[in-house]
Amino acid sequence: MVDVYQKETARHVMVIDSKSFYASVESVDLGLNPLKSLLVVMSQQENTNGGLVLAASPQAKKVLGVSNVMRQRDVPRDPRLAIVQPRMNYYIQKNKQINDIYRKFVADEDLHIYSIDESLLDLTDSWRYLESKYHRTLTDYEVARIIQQEVRDATGIYLTVGIGDNPAMAKM
C-alpha cells in the first residue's frame, strides 16, 4: 500500500494543561509545592449554600479523597488541609502570564487558548526558529520540557503536555 501522507510536513502540536490550576496558584503563593500540598479552593458559603470545592491539589485528592465540586460539609476535617477562597481575577492574571510565556514559542495565530488552564500550541511554523534559538535539532519532547521548565521557573506551576501531529492526537 502506498503511503499518500509521507510527503506531508510533520506538524508539532502540543496541548498544555496547568495541573490543578487554581489550587496550584494558591499553593505557590503560600510557599507550598503544588504537587505536595494539601489545599482546596473553596467557594464562599453564601454563594452556594455551604461552599463548593472549586479546585483541589493532587495530594488533597489522593490523600484525603477530595474532589472538585465536593460540598464543604463533605470535605474531611484535617489540620494539614489549607482551605482558601478563590481569587478569579488573580487566576486570570496568572493565566495571562503563562500564555505570554507560550508566545515566546509561537505566534499569536498558533496559540489557541481553550480555558483558563488549557492551551494548544501549533509549533510547526516556529520549529526552525526554535532550533536556531537553541542551536540544535530538537524533539517535541525536548521542546515540551523547555516550556514546562520556563513556566515552572516563572510561576511555580506544573504543566502536563500532550504531543501529536494534530490537536486530536496531542489531546489523547
Identify the residue ranges that each predicted region occupies:
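Short, well-ordered, mixed-charge alpha-helical segments that flank or form enzyme active sites
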Residues: 122-123, 130, 167-172
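Active-site oxyanion-binding pockets that recognize sulfate/phosphate
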Residues: 85, 133-137
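Residues that scaffold, gate, or flank divalent-cation-dependent active/transport sites
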Residues: 1-120, 125-128
